[in-house]
Amino acid sequence: MEQVVIVDAIRTPMGRSKGGAFRNVRAEDLSAHLMRSLLARNPALEAAALDDIYWGCVQQTLEQGFNIARNAALLAEVPHSVPAVTVNRLCGSSMQALHDAARMIMTGDAQACLVGGVEHMGHVPMSHGVDFHPGLSRNVAKAAGMMGLTAEMLARMHGISREMQDAFAARSHARAWAATQSGAFKNEIIPTGGHDADGVLKQFNYDEVIRPETTVEALATLRPAFDPVSGTVTAGTSSALSDGAAAMLVMSESRARDLGLKPRACVRSMAVVGCDPSIMGYGPVPASKLALKKAGLSASDIGVFEMNEAFAAQILPCIKDLGLMEQIDEKINLNGGAIALGHPLGCSGARISTTLLNLMEHKDVQFGLATMCIGLGQGIATVFERV
């Protein structure tokens, strides 16, 4: 079976969804920009030699509809002979895109693929057009479709206090801002055209979602966002609304070697699981455990983790049940996470994987694990190994 390697991984800056840098930039353009950039950064691979493009996106309507993967590829002037498909596993969509491409390569059905994902939550809101079947209430609590209430449930079940959530959220912003100031994101962010507050077109090379002024004291003043009577989850401890895209060049090790391209890491294992929709945010725990089992590893073998921060109330129970509470500052989301950077749904799986690869190199560790919860009760995880 072919070994799957990651040759390159990039992303756009994360733009604010409300009046942010990409308010006049379409999701297809963000995607096409990264497709062009990956090919330009790796000229040894001819675009026509791509076997497929797998692109994650959740709200596949309006500008993100009608197979945005193909639309973006055409905009990027990828040869017409290269196919493209849009993948939807809600929050895990672009990580699922990676898994789909990896399996194609493992089985010999492909040698080189572009994978990634996008979500423009300013143009296509998360709830746009959502119409749950009324019969679902026979099997699933209605609140299971309200992500904030599932986070509240996890907080109650695991004893996660408001103070713990506020502290974790402040940490996310502080870490992300420190990474920005130190240039830690420089290798992953591709400058992307957008508009400043005055409407002037400019190139953005930083995440505008981060709030460096965030403090625990300021967060403590916010009201609960989902359960106004007894809730603990606030807007400040929830993932920010942002627009962005991320992309990876995935190949067989043999093809990369033949082209003289140096792999950054290989895909050691992959896992997807289901869980109770009412605690959808717990999905990373069984997903990570299964991925580790497939890799023949334990959590202690992993040098760095990227765990998507849907909510502080959600990620903290996952960290706790993976036995990592004492290692947060050494291993978990060292450059901040979605609370600071935002969670553009279809983008985030590739985004956290891209950040993870850079952290693995910076920390000089062998193994890294990226994982995320998925709305309506799923979890997805990938173990990477440097090569």
Swiss-Prot record:
UniProt record, GO biological process: fatty acid beta-oxidation; phenylacetate catabolic process
Keyword entries, A-Z: Acyltransferase, Cytoplasm, Fatty acid metabolism, Lipid degradation, Lipid metabolism, Transferase
GO CC term, one of those recorded: cytoplasm
Compartments it resides in: Cytoplasm
Alphabetized InterPro entries for the sequence: FadA (IPR012805), Thiolase (IPR002155), Thiolase-like (IPR016039), Thiolase-like_sf_Thiolase (IPR050215), Thiolase_acyl_enz_int_AS (IPR020615), Thiolase_AS (IPR020610), Thiolase_C (IPR020617), Thiolase_CS (IPR020613)
Pfam families assigned to the protein according to its UniProt record, in alphabetical order: Thiolase_C (PF02803), Thiolase_N (PF00108)
Catalytic activity: an acyl-CoA + acetyl-CoA = a 3-oxoacyl-CoA + CoA
Pathway in which this enzyme or protein is active: Lipid metabolism; fatty acid beta-oxidation
Enzyme class: transferase
Gene Ontology MF: a single term: acetyl-CoA C-acyltransferase activity
EC annotation from Swiss-Prot or TrEMBL: 2.3.1.16
Signal sequence interval, chain numbering: none
Active site per database record: 91, 343, 373
Subunit relationships: Heterotetramer of two alpha chains (FadB) and two beta chains (FadA).
Purpose of the protein: Catalyzes the final step of fatty acid oxidation in which acetyl-CoA is released and the CoA ester of a fatty acid two carbons shorter is formed.
Sequence similarity: Belongs to the thiolase-like superfamily. Thiolase family.
NCBIfam families linked: AcCoA-C-Actrans (TIGR01930), fadA (TIGR02445), PRK08947.1 (NF006510)
Stored HAMAP family: FadA
Record protein name field: 3-ketoacyl-CoA thiolase
Taxon lineage: Bacteria, Pseudomonadati, Pseudomonadota, Gammaproteobacteria, Enterobacterales
